Amino acid sequence: MTTYVAHVQVLQALHGDEDLLSRLDELGLVERRAEGYLPEEVERALVSYTLVRELGINWEGVEVILRLREELLATHRQVARLLGLLTELGPASPGDSGHPR
């Protein structure tokens, strides 16, 4: 089941910054639905708030930072998955270089 965060809750977290939320929607970074926002959209909105309102970064910079952030998070998940697989395989045999012959 998908969890949503109500519009009013997101606005509270953004200190009532409706303009910022509207801009994020225009840019396709969040989508306003009747049910509310997805948790990852709320996180994106909070990061955007910090970047724009507190650090003065322009919207083009925000888009780049958010894209790079999401790529970094995806890479982190992939590395964690690979580490899990390696752990399942167990330690390599002595003398095994780990390379196929």
Feature locations, PLM:
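The alpha-helix within a helix-turn-helix
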Residues: L11
